[in-house]
A protein has these predicted regions:
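Bacterial N-terminal signal peptides that target proteins for export
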Residues: 1-9
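Pro/Thr/Ser/Gly-rich low-complexity, intrinsically disordered linker/stalk tracts
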Residues: 22-65, 115-159, 213-228
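Solvent-exposed loop/turn segments flanking beta-strands in beta-repeat/beta-sandwich domains
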Residues: 52-80, 151-178
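Beta-strand-rich modules
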Residues: 92-122, 189-219
Length: 363
């Protein structure tokens, strides 16, 4: 009995040893029915890199000698397509793709069209509908058209931005081009050197790199809007001062275009982020600051509670300079408001405000 058990253990050990020492071939072999089923060696190390309206597929081929072709297949919810490539090919660029996530399948084929096990991966190309493309900096954050001048405020020079330039029609009718750069975009406000025909479009063109995109992206041209826009704090000031009956501003915040274009004197009694809204007023001659705020001497000297402030003096000083050049604007400043403004000849200190005399009648 012991001899039989010993023989059985030796036999099992020998079988196990044979199984363990058998090679696990890349061409996979199985037994089924009366014979061996031979699987074709599949591709490995499948990766995909997104590009502009394309996906770049890379893989490692199997050394199986019976491989004749490599099949690359791509599909989304709408379309399916594929291509057969010569043995040894290790990369393929799938072009003309839409804004969609694609399933990429790579497999090996022998001369009879028998196919290996598949290797699958998913990826999405960059297109004009991609959220990273849509949110990419347009460089020009806000623009104003004053007479024949384009005045720009910038959002900065985003990482990845390669080029940005404007195309427009000059005042004399010829075509104009102006290249923006990081130095210009770092300025708080900038006046285009060329005078332009403001009735014609001004388009912004950009190229750049985004995220993992392998290609230089040429973004769709963007037309600068000529619709006047006002800052939120200036609109709040107008609502407080004039109400929202629509003559100057309505309840939704739309400022009357005719009011802004024809205004010659603006009385401003409020803290404000910047004076950029004045660029929407091509006929403004006088900016009167603090005239309607009555303070004691102590109140006027109180920097915290008694003095209106401009929180962005860099933009505001440049705006006043531009307006003075174009409309002859003069600033009349009462008490000690807007001390952040520069010491310019067109900024006149008017001293303290005085309560108006009121005639009283006995009834």
């Amino acid at each position: 009995m012991k001899k039989n058990i010993k023989t059985l253990i030796i036999s099992l050990a020998a079988i196990t040893s044979l199984t363990a020492c058998q090679d696990i071939k890349d061409t996979y072999a199985d037994m089924a029915g009366d014979g061996e089923i031979r699987y074709i060696g599949k591709c490995d190390n499948l990766t995909v890199s997104p590009g502009w309206e394309r996906l770049i597929v890379n893989w490692t081929n199997n050394s199986d000698p019976i491989i004749e072709k490599v099949k690359v297949k791509w599909t989304n919810d709408i379309d399916t397509d594929s291509v057969l490539l010569d043995r040894g090919t290790t990369t393929y660029s799938i072009g003309n793709l839409n804004n969609s996530t694609y399933e990429i399948i790579v497999s090996s084929l022998d001369k009879d069209g028998n196919e290996s096990l598949e290797n699958t991966i998913y990826s999405r190309p960059y297109t004009s509908q991609h959220e990273e493309v849509i949110s990419f900096s347009r460089v020009v954050a806000k623009q104003y058209f004053l007479d024949n001048n384009l005045i720009m405020l910038f959002s900065g020079w985003q990482n990845g931005l390669e080029t940005a330039y404007l195309k427009y029609t000059k005042k004399d009718g010829s075509e104009g081009n102006f290249e923006l750069n990081e130095n210009i975009a770092s300025q708080p406000i900038y006046v285009l050197p060329d005078e332009i025909d403001t009735s014609k479009p001004v388009n912004l063109y950009r190229t750049g790199h985004i995220g993992s995109c392998k290609d230089l992206i040429e973004f769709d041209p963007y037309e600068l809007s000529k619709e006047p826009s006002f800052t939120s704090d200036f609109k709040e000031f107008l609502k407080t001062k004039y109400g929202t009956d629509g003559k100057i501003i309505n309840s939704t915040g739309n400022v009357s275009d005719s009011w802004a274009k024809n205004l010659q004197t603006l009385e401003l009694d409020a803290d404000i982020n910047s004076l950029e809204d004045l660029l929407n007023m091509p006929n403004l001659k006088r900016l009167v600051v603090g005239k309607n705020t009555y303070l004691t001497e102590a109140g006027a000297n109180d920097e915290t509670r008694g003095q209106y402030k401009v929180f962005d003096p860099a933009i505001s000083n440049k705006v006043l300079e531009i307006m003075h050049q174009h409309t002859g604007l003069v600033v009349e400043r009462y008490n000690k408001h807007y001390q952040e403004l520069g010491k310019e000849s067109y900024i006149k200190d008017m001293g303290a405000t005085h309560l108006p005399e009121i005639d009283c009648y006995d009834i």
